[in-house]
């Protein structure tokens, strides 16, 4: 069962403006990355379903985070079917994210009052997802849909939209500012926030610093 309510999840996404996206088969690495993000000001974290037994790792992370990072909202990403969504909800996922929009997932999450953010690449997909009860829709892959102008043009007719942007997002002022100015609700960030060499070197302080910088750029762009 989710620890945080839908309103709490959405409020944290909006307030911080960033959702780190990460997976590693080594649970200790996952713990260190989550802790580093937490210390950097992150309060919403997406663990992606991208490896064998990923759900088992997630279940342990939920229990660990409850004690070590009590304000961190953990959710599951790369969820493409209703069965997988149900599995992660049982393990305590506070939100579900997918690279695609699967209308079968929406009612599973809606019954639990858990946010479902599906991947969308057009106005039609975004609108259909909203009709299915998705409060935050994920534009993915961001680097292929037309850039910040796409978001701005979507927000014109669908001005009530809450768009989470993922793909081709970097923790730099030059990259983040145009997306924030275009009106995104929050951004999802993965490999650029967690370079392989940084993780391999166990340089958790560097990840904390990157998170702090990125959150600062987002806050600045919103002013």
How should these model regions be labeled?
Residues 38-43, 89-96, 110-117, 131-136, ...:
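Glycine-enriched alpha-helix->loop->beta-strand junction motifs that scaffold or abut catalytic
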Residues 43, 96-105, 138-147, 183-204:
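Glycine-rich phosphate-binding active-site loops on the catalytic face of alpha/beta enzymes
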Residues 1-75, 79-83, 87-91, 181, ...:
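Conserved N-terminal beta1-alpha1 strand-loop-helix module at the mouth
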Residues 73-75, 81-119, 123:
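Helix-adjacent hinge/juxtasegments
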Residues 81-91, 124-133, 169-187:
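Catalytic cores of alpha/beta
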Residues 17-22, 45-47, 74-77, 96-97, ...:
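Hydrophobic faces of well-ordered beta-strands that scaffold small-molecule active sites
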Residues 43-52, 84, 89-91, 112, ...:
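Glycine/Thr-rich beta-alpha phosphate-binding loop at enzyme active sites
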Residues 21-25, 48-52, 77-81, 101, ...:
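Active-site beta-loop-alpha junctions enriched in small/polar residues
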């Amino acid at each position: 069962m989710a620890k945080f309510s839908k309103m709490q999840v959405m409020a944290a996404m909006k307030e911080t403006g960033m959702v780190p996206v990460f997976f590693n088969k080594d649970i200790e690495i996952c713990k260190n990355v989550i802790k580093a993000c937490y210390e950097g000001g992150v309060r919403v974290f997406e663990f992606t379903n991208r490896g064998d037994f990923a759900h088992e790792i997630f279940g342990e992370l939920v229990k660990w985070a409850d004690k070590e990072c009590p304000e961190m909202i953990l959710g599951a990403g790369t969820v493409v079917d209703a069965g997988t969504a149900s599995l992660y909800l049982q393990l305590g996922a506070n939100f579900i994210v997918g690279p695609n929009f699967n209308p079968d997932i929406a009612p599973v999450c809606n019954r639990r009052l858990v946010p479902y953010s599906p991947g969308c690449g057009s106005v039609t997909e975004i609108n259909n997802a909203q009709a299915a009860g998705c409060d935050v829709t994920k534009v993915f892959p961001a680097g292929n849909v037309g850039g910040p102008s796409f978001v701005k043009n979507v927000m014109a007719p669908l001005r009530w939209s809450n768009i989470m942007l993922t793909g081709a997002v970097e923790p730099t002022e030059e990259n983040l500012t145009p997306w924030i100015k275009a009106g995104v609700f929050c951004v999802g960030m993965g490999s650029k926030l967690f370079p392989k060499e940084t993780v391999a070197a166990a340089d958790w302080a560097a990840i904390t610093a990157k998170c702090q910088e990125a959150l600062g750029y987002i806050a600045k762009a919103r002013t």
